[in-house]
Amino acid sequence: TINGKPQSELDLTDLSFEVGTVLQDPDSQFVGLTVAEDVAFALENDAQKVDVLHRKVAEWADRLNLKALLNKHPQDLSGGQKQRVALAGVLIDNEPMLLLDEPLANLDPAAGRASMKLLDWLVSQQDLPVIIIDHRIEEVLQIPIDRMVIRADGRVAADDTPEQILKQNILLKNGLREPLYVTALKAAGIDIRAVERLDDLAGLNLTTDQQAQLTSWVANLPQPKETKKADPIISLRGLTFAYPDEEKIFDKFDLTIHRGEMAALVGRNGTGKTTLINLITGFLKPTSGRLLFGDTDISTDSVKQRADRIGYVLQDPNQMISKTMIFDEVALGLELRGVDSETTKKRVFDTLKITGLYPYRNWPISALSFGQKKRVTIAAALVLRPEVLILDEPTAGQDLAHYAQMMDFLVALNRQQGTTVLMVTHDMNLMMAYADRTIVLDQGRVLEDAAPAKVLTNQAVIAKAHLG
């Protein structure tokens, strides 16, 4: 039952009045031409008066930090901003229950924390039941969670308090990533069953002996070694860019990516990460400045020309796929470049073997999992033999098993094939575990450029860039 009503007796329209839903992909929820129109849409359908519309839109825009965005097109916003607009559009109609599918997937750590605090406020002050579906368990646990339900193989594998779930190692057993601090406690030799308030990092209650164990473990961790940087492969020199009728996002911006690096590009939502990638790949053109690939100026190269050197994989593979069959999708780029069929077949098969997709070469893409589709889009980029691969949120929305498979594949690609990898991510765990360099972007400039450990021990950078 839902709110005491048998679900079998409720159609989709009825359900929409009982449960407000925020989808993982906010673009699929937008109906208004501006943020204000989109947030107000439900109230317009309810035939609310204009003054009520204005008051409630202003109220939720203030709560979700959307005031400066009300006149913008939803499609022009960053992923995190889109998420907040979708949330406001649901909350404004006073639904009796709220369901969120991967609400943290597109948010930087600080925005995610703010989102969780808002949900906590809705539960505690508005008495609104909230159901959260998410893989980013550590961030979800930033607020009090009453109950955690783990599903596996079509059944309920666990239904308990978060603290008991963590103490019983249920997450790892069911392919979910446990909070990093729990992993650290285990590595230090601490019996997590004896730790009080294990589900609350801020209130974690360690005994004196447990604190000593943890301190000793941290002190004995191996220190990362400085490595000599290779030659530049991508160099941005004096890059300036602004969207029409807006202030400059980049003003005489400089950045160098070195050959063979596995780098992470991080920063708060809306700080220019996606814009920067679009400038590198050619989807946007700078007002001034130069883009070098090695020693070659590629500033005037087309998107197609740059794709031969720089592969780009979007966060959502469904936005990139244009063919029905796996082979056809991976072969498309070669066919558009006039490569003969025999060469195309060989290069596609070689690429499918590298990406672990060769057994599925004759499969329809619709039969694949999200993670496998992601690999197809990577294969479609790799078949052109680019020297650089740029990925937007490579592991977003994936469980631990698919997360590990994807990252192991990228590491092998980097180490064995020599491919330079640039990952745009909000996942600090991913950055710490896999990147050898972190570039922190803030308001169109490089705030920090250092090893991941150095970035995450700089409190000023963490606060300014919303990394924690």
State where each predicted segment sits.
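Conserved ABC ATPase signature
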Residues: 73-77, 81, 364-368
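The feature captures the beta-strand-to-loop junction immediately N-terminal to the Walker
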Residues: 266-268
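Helix-to-loop junction immediately C-terminal to a conserved catalytic motif
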Residues: 281
